[in-house]
Amino acid sequence: GVGIAAIEIGKIMGAKIIATVGSDEKMAVAKAHGADHAINYREGPFRDGVLEITGGEGANAIYDPVGGEVFEQSLRCIAPEVRIMPVGFAGGTIQKIPANILLVKNVTVCGLNMGYYFGWSDKDVRDQFSPLMQQLLAKEFAWFEAGLLNPRVTQIYALDDFQEAMAI
């Protein structure tokens, strides 16, 4: 999923990756795709683990596709002067953002909805962002062709079964 892509792109960019995942199986998958560390957030708060791994400094950037409680925990182990990027709500709960933590730590929250750049929003800005998106996609395809991005395919569906596949 998007977490695997985030791990692999982070490694390409030279980051030390601490993956927080929801199962032991996902811990193994995260490590197989390049995570330096993996913590199962279902086993309890992961703040202490992240702080231990970072020598008490906290994470320098956080990418969160889960939301809810995971986002709240992430804010508690983020370093000052960095960004946290919520990209979804896979956990089912939309995160609430406590402004006091943002203020005290000088943290920036940066949302990302890729659909905005592809015309899937109220305002169609495809033409404006087309050169940037083409450049980004060309870079991603080059990484894929070089074997640096390795999507995890667990099942293949016919195009006619698109809605069934998306429900999984």
Annotate the PLM regions.
Residues 1-44:
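Mid-domain Rossmann-like dinucleotide-binding core that forms the NAD(H)/NADP(H) cofactor-binding site
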Residues 141, 146-156, 163-168:
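C-terminal capping/lid region of NAD(P)-dependent oxidoreductase domains
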Residues 45-56:
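Short amphipathic alpha-helix with an adjacent loop that forms part of the alpha/beta core around
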Residues 35, 58-59, 102, 149, ...:
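Local beta-strand N-terminus motif with an aromatic residue
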